[in-house]
């Protein structure tokens, strides 16, 4: 910092410093750093940053109030004034604005530099030469405090991530240690996995085949030894998407291992019962058979209701009035029967007349 600036007042220096000048566009910028706005690459340290901003290129048309309103969007402004004796271009003015916080000044410079303002282009730069010794000391202390806080947070996050990684690795090690290692005969393992899922994923359904399935009993199978089976496997909706065909294993039976042959025969018989062959049925045929079964069930239920014996108390019958005369009793019974017949007959709905449109007239 210049000694003359420190000894004099804050607002007295009118010297043009090198960092006040606008730099040219860097032509050596790499391709990946090129953007829409051609700006010089500039890195600011804490010494170069400041709460004081020097605004150049303001049109000299009395727009100080609008300028202050624009910069007030980014933070609290403590003080501002025009620098009349500062060398500037013709018909432009230079203003000095002091913000309350350094972050506000940083945001204001980033957003207002090279901004169009009332027909002119603003040039905003830091002015640390207007700071006092106390302000510079406070700025450095704040920066040191922020660096300590950021480094501590980074170390804490790193330690937490390391703990999480160690816990996950220890849990995986314990799981692998607890898991027992079972050694099985390859023939038994292959036999157990006949109708099971492979690697946790279900088997894909196979396309429908013919009704006849051939099952081989030995490696050398004769045509007379083929078995012909016809069994249904569709579900209630006539679909075969849940069907898994049986996998038959051919094994040679030795005379010495008779017990193993018996077990294998039992296993094949169970597989035959549990997983029959495929039979394809069209949906229309399935629906017709289902409807026929329902009709038969309802018919048998009605027949059972008619012929079945009723158990329990009967409902009280309607009281019959005695007219003390045979002719009156006959008339009353006739009226009563007619009323019951009329009540039992369903109401006839009125026939709606069809509205026919008149035929168009023929033209001669």
Curated annotation (Swiss-Prot):
Protein name (record): RNA-binding protein 48
Organism classification: Eukaryota, Metazoa, Chordata, Craniata, Vertebrata
Composition-biased stretches (Low complexity): 247-262
Region entry Disordered, spans: 157-191, 239-291, 343-364
Organism: Danio rerio
InterPro entries: Nucleotide-bd_a/b_plait_sf (IPR012677), RBD_domain_sf (IPR035979), RBM48 (IPR039599), RBM48_RRM (IPR034264)
Keywords: mRNA processing, mRNA splicing, RNA-binding, Spliceosome
A cellular component term, taken from the record's GO annotations: spliceosomal complex
Family recorded in the similarity comment: Belongs to the RBM48 family.
Domain (RRM) ranges: 51-129
């Amino acid at each position: 910092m210049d000694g003359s600036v420190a000894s004099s007042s804050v607002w007295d220096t009118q010297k043009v410093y090198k960092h006040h000048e606008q730099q040219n566009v860097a032509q050596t910028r790499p391709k990946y750093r090129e953007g829409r706005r051609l700006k010089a690459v500039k890195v600011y340290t804490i010494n170069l940053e400041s709460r004081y901003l020097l605004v150049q290129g303001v049109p000299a048309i009395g727009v100080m109030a609008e300028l202050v309103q624009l910069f007030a969007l980014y933070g609290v402004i403590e003080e501002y004034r025009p620098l009349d004796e500062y060398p500037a271009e013709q018909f432009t003015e230079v203003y000095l604005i002091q913000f309350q916080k350094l972050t506000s000044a940083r945001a204001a410079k980033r957003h207002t530099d090279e901004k169009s303002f009332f027909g002119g282009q603003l040039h905003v730069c830091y002015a640390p030469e207007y700071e006092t010794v106390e302000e510079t000391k406070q700025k450095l202390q704040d920066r040191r405090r922020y660096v300590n806080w950021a480094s501590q947070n980074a170390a804490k996050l790193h330690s937490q991530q390391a703990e999480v990684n160690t816990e996950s690795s220890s849990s995986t090690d314990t799981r692998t240690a607890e898991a027992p290692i079972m050694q099985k005969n390859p023939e038994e393992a292959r036999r157990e996995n006949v109708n099971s899922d492979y690697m946790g994923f279900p088997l894909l359904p196979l396309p429908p085949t013919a009704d006849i399935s051939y099952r081989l009993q030995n490696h050398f199978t004769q045509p007379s030894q083929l078995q012909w089976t016809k069994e249904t496997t569709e579900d209630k909706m006539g679909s075969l998407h849940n069907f898994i065909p049986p996998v038959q294993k051919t094994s040679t039976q030795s005379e010495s291992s008779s017990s193993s042959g018996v077990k294998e025969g039992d296993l094949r018989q169970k597989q035959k019962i549990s997983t029959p062959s495929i039979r394809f049925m069209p949906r229309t045929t399935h629906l017709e058979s289902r409807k026929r079964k329902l009709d038969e069930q309802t018919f048998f239920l009605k027949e059972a209701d008619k012929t079945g014996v009723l158990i329990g108390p009967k409902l009280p019958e309607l009281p019959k009035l005695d007219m003390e005369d045979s002719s009156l009793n006959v008339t009353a019974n006739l009226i009563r029967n007619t009323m019951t017949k009329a009540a039992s007959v369903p109401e006839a709905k009125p026939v709606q007349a069809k509205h026919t449109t008149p035929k168009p007239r023929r033209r001669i």
